[in-house]
Design a protein with these regions (language model features):
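Acidic, turn-prone loop/beta-hairpin segments
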Residues: 94-119, 207-232, 247, 251, ...
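Structured secondary-structure scaffolds
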Residues: 1-200, 225-257, 272-279, 376
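Short secondary-structure junction motifs
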Residues: 86-89, 289, 360-363
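Long, well-ordered alpha-helical segments
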Residues: 197-209
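A generic structural signal for well-ordered coil/turn residues at beta-strand boundaries
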Residues: 2, 26, 90, 95, ...
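NTP/phosphate- and nucleic-acid-binding module
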Residues: 11, 22, 40-41, 212-215, ...
Length: 378
């Protein structure tokens, strides 16, 4: 306190010395070590740091890769050298997300305008109040200075938080910039409405999901597609391909929506597939998913459910599309059963209409790589 409280050398008045003089990067380069145990008076707990570190996944803007992450590495290497921490590298994996962008607008006086102050008519933009034509600029990273920002509260009020989350993740891979558009938000909102209608289409509250063992092709196809898309969503999320996960969720929705229920057994299969769909959607749209889970008759919380397991027997394809080559060049394709014999596949390949144009004599050799490719040598 004696050092902090002093006399100003210019005006001789009472003053306080500034204590926060470290650069921000200096102070933020080892916070993850401190976060492992907050309940002490030392810099960080070596025991807790040994348990938690290194950080499994770092997510941040690309600008961090050459500033914050670089300094963090320096700190960890220095602390490791003086035996204060066991790691040399602070982070196992890095994912740099893109920016949310929006078109910029200016009025006739070259003043920036908010998107909410502008409306579109045909291919031109106009000022909401004056109806004057507006200058349409580049699509750039959202910034307050250029006013190309969207108030999240407006989106939540008009569409709900789930719609905003769904659109942001569905538009493009997370590492790429995305353009925020009203049409894109509206499209996400329409899909969630279709999902809601599917959930409420039939009363599934009294349907018990018992043994899932389809006995006909229609039911088998639904279950196979369900597990196929469960597998796709799972892998996509693990690899941060959220846009691909949402594409698979949309595909599963279409399969369920097109499934015709003609008996109680059909409702069992449908409820099972809908249950899987709800769980897959829940990390992206938690609010509507929790409601949907309750509507189909569940009394427990959706957030307490396990992630769907993969049943590999349903991922196996009964039929495959095999390319046919003639002297190494692809000339046709045939669809065959996975257990087809080599003699049968030879007959099918040689009887293919397009192959007959190129194979006019007895082939010298027919090379078959099972379930992969056929090459006819002439």
């Amino acid at each position: 306190k004696d050092w902090i409280n002093t006399i100003c050398p210019k005006c001789n008045s009472q003053a306080k010395r500034e204590t926060d003089t470290f650069d921000t990067f200096f102070e933020s380069s080892w916070y993850f070590a401190r976060f492992t145990d907050l309940n002490n008076d030392i810099a960080f707990s070596e025991k807790a740091a040994k348990y938690w570190l290194p950080v499994d996944q770092y997510i941040g803007g690309v600008e961090h890769a050459v500033l914050h992450l670089l300094y963090s590495r320096f700190f960890m290497k220095a602390l490791n050298k003086i035996n204060q921490i066991h790691i040399k590298e602070p982070f196992k994996s890095l994912k740099t997300q893109g920016m949310v962008c929006h078109r910029t607008f200016k009025n006739q006086n070259d003043q920036w305008l908010f998107p909410k102050e502008v409306y579109k008519e045909n291919q031109d933009y106009f000022h909401m109040k004056s109806n004057e034509k507006v200058k349409s600029g580049r699509i750039e990273k959202m910034s307050k200075s250029k006013k190309n920002v969207i108030d999240p509260n407006t989106i939540i009020d008009n569409y709900g938080a789930d719609t905003a989350r769904f659109f942001i993740l569905s538009d493009s891979p997370p590492e790429r910039d995305m353009e925020w558009t009203e049409s894109g938000v509206d499209g996400s909102w329409r899909f969630l409405n279709k999902f809601w209608n599917l959930i409420n289409k039939e009363d599934l509250t009294k349907i018990e999901i018992t043994n899932i063992n389809p006995s006909n092709n229609k039911d088998l196809l639904l279950i196979k597609n369900t597990y196929k898309f469960v597998n796709q969503v799972t892998k996509s999320i693990e690899n941060f391909h959220f846009n691909l996960a949402i594409a698979a969720i949309r595909s599963l929705f279409n399969e369920i929506n097109n499934y015709q229920t003609v008996s109680t057994n059909c409702l069992i299969f449908k409820k099972f597939s809908i249950s899987q769909l709800i769980i897959l959607l829940s990390p992206i749209c938690p609010h509507i998913s929790e409601e949907a889970w309750s509507i189909i008759g569940n009394t427990n919380r959706l957030s307490e459910q396990k992630w769907p397991a993969i049943v590999t027997k349903y991922l196996q394809e009964d039929k495959l599309t095999i390319p046919i080559q003639v002297n190494g060049k692809k000339r046709a394709e045939i669809m065959v059963e996975t257990d087809i014999s080599k003699d049968e596949i030879k007959k099918l390949a040689l009887s293919e209409k397009n192959i007959k144009k190129f194979v006019t004599q007895e082939p010298k050799k027919i090379i078959i790589v099972p379930n992969r490719i056929i090459n006819i040598v002439i």
